[in-house]
From Swiss-Prot:
Gene source species: Dehalococcoides mccartyi (strain CBDB1)
Cited function: Catalyzes the oxidation of 5,10-methylenetetrahydrofolate to 5,10-methenyltetrahydrofolate and then the hydrolysis of 5,10-methenyltetrahydrofolate to 10-formyltetrahydrofolate.
Reaction(s) catalysed (UniProt annotation): (6R)-5,10-methylene-5,6,7,8-tetrahydrofolate + NADP(+) = (6R)-5,10-methenyltetrahydrofolate + NADPH; (6R)-5,10-methenyltetrahydrofolate + H2O = (6R)-10-formyltetrahydrofolate + H(+)
Keywords: Amino-acid biosynthesis, Histidine biosynthesis, Hydrolase, Methionine biosynthesis, Multifunctional enzyme, NADP, One-carbon metabolism, Oxidoreductase, Purine biosynthesis
Protein name in the entry: Bifunctional protein FolD
UniProt key word Ligase: no
Biological or metabolic pathway of the protein: One-carbon metabolism; tetrahydrofolate interconversion
CDD domains: NAD_bind_m-THF_DH_Cyclohyd (cd01080)
Taxonomic classification: Bacteria, Bacillati, Chloroflexota, Dehalococcoidia, Dehalococcoidales
Chain positions recorded as NADP(+) binding sites: G166, R167, S168, S195, T236
Alphabetical list of InterPro entries matching this protein: Aminoacid_DH-like_N_sf, NAD(P)-bd_dom_sf, THF_DH/CycHdrlase, THF_DH/CycHdrlase_cat_dom, THF_DH/CycHdrlase_CS, THF_DH/CycHdrlase_NAD-bd_dom
PANTHER family listed in its UniProt record: C-1-TETRAHYDROFOLATE SYNTHASE, CYTOPLASMIC, C-1-TETRAHYDROFOLATE SYNTHASE, CYTOPLASMIC-RELATED
One GO CC term, this protein: cytosol
């Protein structure tokens, strides 16, 4: 029997309507409009596409947006000056600097310059520390999206063994921290695997919930998955193009093989991807509410 397909597009659409209602209410009752500033350095097509999708989503939800493009040869000082301006701008609730950045730019220097209260990507050390301590913070968008996918799909997380394959600062590490918290929608036993892990299939087969987040197309095969497990595929690698020039994406899981063994599985596309951008919008809304003391 094939697995239940967890449709991230449908779940993200439901959250989108919740956010739209809150944005409208915030405008009507308090005269507050959440605002997101995006910063893009250079002309990378993929980065342009990602930023465009975020701007369109802001427009769709009634969130104010500003886009600040900078040339490929921009300096650290250029970015720091812009970020200081955005930090001080009351119209801007959240700031997103699209990564990766050109080689001459210090990513850590730039991201750490963002006011933690406007760090809607959840990358600032202050927010990372708060996340680890279980304090109110901005959660990184993709890991938070994974958690919401599980919760809204009715999948129990508490008391389960979650195995995460991948230890990146963007997904693996923060997701582990989120899911091990003593909190609703978490409280799992978490194992992180990586390139140095021995006997990887033995460990992945122990997972009640298996998360693949290493960026290796179809790396997770059926023999690595326990019968009845929940499989979340975070991978999105471009493996080619259609004759029309559209990107062909592959996840980290061999979907066709694994879906015959898993209880539930996310596809690529239409799985985790749509959740990432909607969590960014949720963080932007949260930032606007915190800025005026509506929430902590």
């Amino acid at each position: 029997m094939s697995a239940h397909i967890i449709n991230g597009t449908e779940i993200a659409a439901a959250i989108r309507e919740e956010i739209r209602s809150e944005v409208t209410a915030l405008k009507t009752k308090a005269g507050i409009v959440p605002g997101l500033a995006t910063v893009l350095v250079g002309d990378d097509p993929a980065s342009h596409s990602y930023v465009d999708s975020k701007i369109k989503m802001c427009q769709n939800l009634g969130i104010y947006s500003e886009h600040h493009p900078l040339p490929q040869n921009a300096t650290n000082e250029d970015l720091l000056t812009l970020i200081a301006k955005l930090n001080a701008d009351p119209k801007i609730s959240g700031i997103l600097v699209q990564v990766p950045l050109p080689a001459q730019i210090s990513e850590s220097l730039v991201l750490n310059a963002i006011n933690p209260d406007k760090d809607v990507d959840g990358f600032h050390p202050v927010n990372v520390g708060r996340m680890c301590l279980g304090e109110p913070c901005f959660l990184p968008c993709t890991p938070h999206g994974v958690q919401e996918l599980l919760i809204r799909s009715g999948i129990k997380i508490e008391g389960t063994h979650v195995v995460i394959v991948g230890r990146s600062n963007l997904v693996g590490k923060p997701l582990a921290n989120i899911l091990l918290q003593k909190a609703p929608g978490a409280n799992a036993t978490v194992t992180i695997c990586h390139s140095g892990t021995k006997n990887l299939p033995e460990i992945t087969r122990q997972a009640d919930i298996l998360v693949a987040a290493m960026g290796k197309p179809k790396f997770i095969t059926a023999d690595m998955v326990r019968e009845g497990a929940v499989v979340i595929d975070v991978g999105t690698t471009c493996i080619g193009y259609t004759p029309e020039g559209k990107r062909i994406l592959s996840g980290d899981v061999d979907f066709e093989e694994v879906k015959e063994k898993a209880f539930a599985i996310t596809p690529v596309p239409k799985g985790v991807g749509p959740m990432t951008i909607i969590m960014l919008m949720l963080n932007t809304l949260t930032a606007a509410k915190r800025a005026v003391g509506l929430i902590k």
